[in-house]
Amino acid sequence: MNIYAVGGAIRDELLGMPVQDRDYVVVGATPEQMIAQGFRPVGKDFPVFLHPDTQEEYALARTERKTSAGYHGFQFFYAPDVTLEDDLARRDLTINAMAREVTPDGALIGPVIDPFNGREDLEHRVFRHVSDAFLEDPVRILRVARFSARFADFSVAPETLALMRKMVEAGEVDALVPERVWQEVSRGLMEKKPSRMFEVLRDCGALARVLPEIDALYGVPQRADYHPEVDTGVHVMMVVDHAAAQNYALAVRFAALTHDLGKATTPEDVLPRHIGHEGRSVDLLKPLCERLRVPNECRDLALLVAREHGNIHRVMETKAAGLVRLFERSDALRKPARFAEALQACEADARGRLGFEANAYPQAERLRQALVAARAVDAGAVAKSYENSPAEIKDAVHRERVRAVAKALNEAPSGQA
């Protein structure tokens, strides 16, 4: 029995990056031998075991064969005579198909085992498939795109990109289940440069299949005085990358990605203006979230930002009454943390423009100050003073909040948005 650390741990070690998790492959063992040594079986489709002390996963060396469409359609084969190279050959990219032997307690020993020249591809910053078996698993398209967001200076080998395009044309991507698409897209959004993920998906044609709403934004012009980058798709990628650079949460990054969906459906005769695109964005975003089964937290923030980002951008001219109405529409009085995330997405939107990247965004501070004042109003006390006129309570609380906001901003309470 020989044990090897494989995959990402070896890749990251060679890149000088911290190794978060290790995957282990066991060669020359049977399930019975693993159990006899105290390992606990947990795998459903193939033998995976938890180490009795570290609880790390150890898998028996295996090969796989495609049996049907999609990423579930595989049959696995494992036996003591399956070699390490057999196991590495089924992996997606050469940079993930390297190994090092380890001792039973997990200490690395011996040289890097690299049968597919992954080390050379690491040095040249290239994503290259191990074999034509890459064609059999459409998730690998999403993984290459996600790795591109993590390792932004890597390129996809031309022959690998050609395989990815072939898979898209064959409809393999269409067999992906929504949860897996969301899993990979959300992980890519949390990488250093998410725009690279969407660039790779677009290059191979997969973006139009998995996120047609994003693909449709490319080539849609915007007013050059507001958007020197002009292309809406380029703008959205700048917004997402800004959100990533600020280390914002996933919900903020997803809102940044989807805030301008409605610009793709702007009538051509009114371009490059996009009047009413906020409402159209909401209409497109709802079915997108349903289709990908986006978590409620991400969906709700994205809908809020899509609907209100234009109003938030204009708040420097908005009076106290309009600010309070914005808070009421956005449920900011009950959910200030979510509203704070909406401001992050809007700031990313404002800065995700060519030449605007370092500009101040005073709208955020104005709204934060106003929200503190509005939330400080004791709605219960106001309600008590109107206990004989309950129908008037809502308007009375609103008026008190307007007065409080106006005072905080040193403005008159009258005025509209």
Swiss-Prot record:
PANTHER family: MULTIFUNCTIONAL CCA PROTEIN. CTP binds at G8, R11, R91, R143, R146. It catalyses: a tRNA precursor + 2 CTP + ATP = a tRNA with a 3' CCA end + 3 diphosphate; a tRNA with a 3' CCA end + 2 CTP + ATP = a tRNA with a 3' CCACCA end + 3 diphosphate. GO terms for biological process: RNA repair; tRNA 3'-terminal CCA addition. Catalyzes the addition and repair of the essential 3'-terminal CCA sequence in tRNAs without using a nucleic acid template. Adds these three nucleotides in the order of C, C, and A to the tRNA nucleotide-73, using CTP and ATP as substrates and producing inorganic pyrophosphate. tRNA 3'-terminal CCA addition is required both for tRNA processing and repair. Also involved in tRNA surveillance by mediating tandem CCA addition to generate a CCACCA at the 3' terminus of unstable tRNAs. While stable tRNAs receive only 3'-terminal CCA, unstable tRNAs are marked with CCACCA and rapidly degraded. This is Multifunctional CCA protein. The lineage of its organism: Bacteria, Pseudomonadati, Pseudomonadota, Betaproteobacteria, Burkholderiales. Magnesium is required for nucleotidyltransferase activity. Nickel for phosphatase activity.
